[in-house]
Amino acid sequence: KGGPIIMVQAENEFGSYVAQRKDIPLEEHRRYNAKIKRQLADAGFNVPLFTSDGSWLFEGGSTPGALPTANGESNVENLKKVVNEYHGGVGPYMVAEFYPGWLMHWAEPFPDISDSGIARQTETYLQNDVSFNFYMVHGGTNFGFTSGANYDKKHDIQPDLTSYDYDAPGWVTPKFDSIRNVIRKYVTYDVPEAPAPIPLIEIPSISLTKVADVLALAKEGEPVASPTPLTFEQLNQGYGYVLYSTHFNQPLKGRLEIPGLRDYATIYVDGERVGELNRCFNQYAMEIDIPFNATLDILVENMGRINYGEEIVRNTKGIISSVKINGSEISDWKMYKLPMDRMPALVSGEPYVYKNGSPEVAALGNKPVLYEGTFHLSDTGDTFIDMEDWGKGIIFINGINIGRYWYAGPQQTLYIPGVWLNKGENKIVIYEQLNNDR
C-alpha cells in the first residue's frame, strides 16, 4: 500500500524479563507476547512484525509470526543459527541494535568502543548479508527527569546520565568517518559530503541575582502527615524530590538506617547538612547526632526509574521502608512534595528569597538552594552549560528542565537547544542541592 512504515516492533528485550522472572510460567509469558501481536493486528498494522532480544534469549522473547532480531550479536554464524531455529529455518537476518557506543551511568567512566572495531564489524555484516541498525546513529539528551536507570546486584541502581550520547553526539567524529568509509564501498551511488557541524553560540555571562532557601520554601507548602514515611507514589508524585521531616523531643545519637531509600538522600539536622545516603553506592546508613528539640530532614531524590529487566515492576520511589536509629523505628513524619515539574518562581520580597551576596545567603551554609538569574543574547543557537564547579542538581532554562548535573560525573556539561533560547533576555534557575564550596 505504500507509506513510511515497513516493519513494526512487537516487543523489545522481553526475553530478558522472561529469563529473570522464573516465577512466571513460560506459557504465561508467551500468552502475553501473543496478545501484543494480536493488538497490533487489530489496530491495522499489516506489515511484518519483529522482536528484539539478545540471541540467547529468543526462547522467551520471540513470538511465532514475528521475525526475531538480535541485539549486539557480532557472531554472524550464531545469528543465522538462532534466527533459523526460531523462524522456520529462514531469515532475513538482522541485528536490531548494533552498538557504536553504550549508555552511561552517573559515577562510572565513559565506555570506550573503538572506531576500528565498529568499522570491522560493519564490514562483517555487509559481507554476510546481515541487516543492521546502529543504536545509536546519533545520540540525544534525556531532558528533565526522563533519563531512566539500570539495575544490577552490585550497584542496586545505575542512574543514566542526562546525556544519551552513545558516542554519537550529533556531529561528525572519527567513528562516523570510519563507518562511512566502509559503507561507501557497498553502495552504487556517490556518497554526499558529511554535514557541516551545527554552529554553537557562547553565552557571554550569567548573572545570578536571587537565592532561595529550599528547605524553608518547601515547608511553606501543606505537608502530608503519616506515622510512617510515604512513597512518592502514595503521595501521587512521579519524579523530583520529597522532603521527609520529623521532630525529636529528646536527644538521640547513633546509627541512622534507611534500607528502603530510593534513591539519593541529603540529611539535615536543624537545617545543617550532616551527610548523604546514596542507593547507587549501596549507602543506606550513617552515624547521626540529634540534639534536644531538633528537627531531622531527609531530602530524597528519585534518580530515575529502572527500565530494563525484572526490577521494572519494583520501581517505587522515596522511602519505602521504616527509618531507624539504633534499631528503633522513627515515627510521626511530615512530607513536603517538591516535584520540580516546572521552573520555580523566585519573587523578590517573598520569605526565604534573598538577594545574592546578602548576609542571609551567606547564612544558608550548605542548605539546598535555588539560584535565579538572567543572561542576554544577540543571537540564538545551540550551546552547552558547564557545571563542573557545582555540586548536584538540575537546571531550568526559560521554564524548561534541561536535566541533571552531578560532580560525580562523568558528564559535566548540559546541552541547551537553540530553539529554547530567546534573542534578548533569558532566565535561568539552578537547583543546587549540595551547595558545596566547589
Q: Where on the chain are the PLM-derived regions?
A:
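Surface-exposed, short loops/turns at beta-strand junctions within beta-sandwich domains
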Residues: 289-292, 419-423
